[in-house]
């Protein structure tokens, strides 16, 4: 279906015809743990990866399969792997690329959970990370070590929406035989397709814009099919016989989808962060309206920014669409259709003023999620990024007077009026 536009693909990929078992137009929920094999030889072929298809519910499910195929198509990748959460997608990706004694180069200004994983949890397993100013390409290059296994970035940094130069970073990664891994949760494939700019692996917390309604946890890894694992020589568990799967070479068994297949067959098999069929079904419902919601999110965000930049109680607004943002040129390059409905601003004063503003809101919900159709607010320094030290907070561009907004799809007049409620409480 590659000849169709995004808005059509988000509705039809993976189920171009009604369900063959029932003629249902909607994707059914296949609530089963396991699948009947036609014969012993058929079972052996499935387990040997010689025959594609369902093996066991922890690894695959037909509802899950439609979701994976659809998001992979929207991103321009060759395969998808859906998991129980965005955190699971990030963790499985890093663990598939780096083993004990190895190293990652990562953007400083990323989601607090990802930063904590890389800075504190993975070092316990022997995987260390150097955090870099992603805009300083010399610093990025200098951070690469002989044991480095990936460069990790976000299309829109969390929470300040800083933007990396994906093309330039892909060139650096590939020159060193490394894949470029990018979290596109805030970008979404509707606004930007990182694989077209050189990224090799794309990650989403599907909990956010893909699901879109604050009902469902999920994550997905998209294999771009662009990285030559055999040529690199740095990932023998993918390109050489793998003893954990009776000597299979995933580059031979799965071709361009070797990375996604390795995670499914080994890491998902062994660690079990599987997605349920019902969750996959809910995420498909969100996917069907992704473009419509993103257009409204962007429209409302533009008007909120116009309001905030002129408000006397606002010290600074951090959004790359603004000309004074250091990444404005990159925003125009990579986001020609707009975007970035999650951003921060600094209120005049400190933590107390920020708290009063937040507590004075009525429509905005104070919670840790983002990218919901409902408008959301939080104080990052004491919540989502509270595990970071003061130095790490400063590196991430988060202050005690920083407030994060996630602009929803309510009527813009009501959103602006509620922001007035917050400022009135200060």
Language-model regions, residue ranges each:
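Conserved PLP-enzyme active-site core in the AAT-like
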Residues: 2, 14, 18, 81-310
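N-terminal "arm"/small-domain region of PLP-dependent enzymes with the aminotransferase-like
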Residues: 2-61, 69-70
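Conserved N-terminal alpha-helix of the aminotransferase class I/II PLP-enzyme fold
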Residues: 39-91, 113-121
């Amino acid at each position: 279906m590659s000849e169709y536009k995004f808005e059509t693909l988000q509705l039809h990929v993976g189920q171009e015809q009604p369900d063959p078992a029932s003629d249902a137009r909607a994707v059914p929920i296949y609530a089963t743990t396991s699948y009947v094999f036609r014969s012993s030889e058929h079972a052996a072929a499935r387990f040997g990866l010689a025959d594609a298809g369902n093996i066991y519910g922890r690894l695959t499910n037909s509802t899950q399969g439609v979701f994976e195929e659809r998001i992979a198509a929207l991103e321009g990748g060759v395969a998808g792997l859906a998991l129980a959460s965005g955190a699971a997608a990030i963790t499985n990706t890093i663990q598939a690329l780096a083993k004990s004694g190895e190293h990652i180069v990562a953007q400083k200004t990323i989601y607090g959970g990802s930063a904590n994983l890389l800075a504190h949890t993975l070092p316990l397993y022997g995987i260390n990370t150097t955090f870099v100013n992603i805009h300083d390409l010399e610093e990025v290059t200098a951070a690469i070590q002989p044991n480095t296994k990936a460069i990790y970035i976000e299309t829109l940094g969390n929470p300040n929406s800083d933007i990396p130069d994906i093309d330039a970073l892909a060139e650096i990664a590939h020159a060193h035989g490394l894949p470029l891994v990018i979290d596109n949760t805030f970008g979404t494939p509707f606004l930007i397709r990182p694989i077209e700019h050189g990224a090799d692996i794309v990650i989403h917390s599907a909990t956010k814009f893909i699901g879109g309604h604050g009902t469902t946890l999920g994550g997905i890894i998209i294999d771009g099919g662009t990285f030559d694992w055999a040529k690199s020589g740095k990932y023998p568990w993918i390109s050489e016989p793998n003893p954990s799967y009776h000597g299979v070479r995933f580059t031979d068994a799965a071709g361009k989808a070797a990375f996604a297949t390795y995670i499914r067959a080994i890491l998902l098999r062994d660690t079990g962060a599987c997605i349920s069929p019902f969750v996959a079904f809910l995420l498909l419902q969100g996917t069907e309206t992704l473009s419509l919601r993103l257009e409204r999110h962007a429209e409302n965000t533009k008007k909120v920014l116009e309001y905030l930049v002129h408000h006397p109680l606002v010290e600074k607004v951090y959004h790359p669409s603004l000309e004074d943002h250091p990444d404005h040129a990159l925003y125009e390059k990579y986001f020609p259709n707009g975007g970035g409905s999650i951003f921060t601003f600094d209120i005049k004063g400190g933590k107390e003023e920020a708290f009063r503003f937040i507590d004075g809101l009525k429509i905005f919900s104070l919670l840790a999620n983002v990218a919901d159709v409902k408008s959301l607010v939080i104080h990052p320094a004491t919540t989502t990024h509270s595990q970071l030290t003061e130095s790490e907070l400063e590196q991430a561009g988060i202050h005690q007077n920083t407030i994060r907004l996630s602009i929803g799809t309510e009527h813009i007049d009501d959103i602006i009026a509620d922001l007035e409620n917050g400022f009135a409480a200060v």
